[in-house]
């Protein structure tokens, strides 16, 4: 869609949609929630008890760690963990962030390499559930055992934000 945009206003709008509807929720929000969930599961694995207040404290600490000094954490933000009860049926939120990271890498490879990368992606999809996520991603040419795909995705998000600023002039 972005390639077919004819005005800077259209391009800015589309870049804004990429950030707000795709990457912020599915990459950032789910990444934060996955990190939080991992911290809670550490307590469970250690057979430690916890209360709703403990869960709120852990969520607030997660937000503070993720955003640092750049974002003011409003009172009540620590209660966000309560809004999606289905997240606690297995490790759920990280799949959004991981999937979007893999998809961003594959998209980048298709743009750079063309058909060979697209063919790898189709072969990876055809694997279905015959391999674990690491194996399927590897078949697509993405090594999720390193931080490179994550860093590349963050770099892509930065580029889209730069484009929003560029099209705002």
Label each residue range with its predicted role.
Residues 1-25:
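Zinc-dependent metallopeptidase catalytic helix centered on the HExxH motif
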Residues 1-4, 10, 30, 34, ...:
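C-terminal, non-catalytic "cap/extension" segments appended to globular domains
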Residues 20-31, 39:
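Long, K/E/R/D-enriched contiguous segments that form extended
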């Amino acid at each position: 869609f972005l390639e077919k945009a004819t005005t800077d206003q259209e391009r800015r709008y589309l870049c804004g949609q990429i950030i707000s509807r795709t990457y912020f929720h599915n990459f950032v929000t789910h990444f934060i929630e996955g990190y939080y969930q991992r911290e809670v599961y550490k307590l469970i694995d250690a057979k430690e008890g916890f209360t709703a207040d403990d869960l709120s404290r852990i969520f607030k600490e997660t937000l503070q760690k993720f955003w640092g000094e750049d974002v003011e954490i409003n009172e009540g933000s620590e209660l966000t963990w309560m809004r999606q009860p289905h997240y606690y049926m297995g490790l759920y939120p990280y799949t959004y962030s991981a999937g979007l990271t893999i998809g961003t890498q594959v998209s980048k490879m298709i743009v750079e390499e063309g058909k060979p990368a697209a063919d790898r992606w189709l072969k990876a999809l055809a694997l279905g559930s015959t391999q674990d996520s690491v194996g399927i991603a590897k078949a697509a040419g993405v090594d999720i055992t390193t931080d490179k795909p994550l860093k590349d995705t963050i770099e892509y998000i930065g580029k889209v934000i730069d484009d929003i600023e560029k099209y705002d002039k």
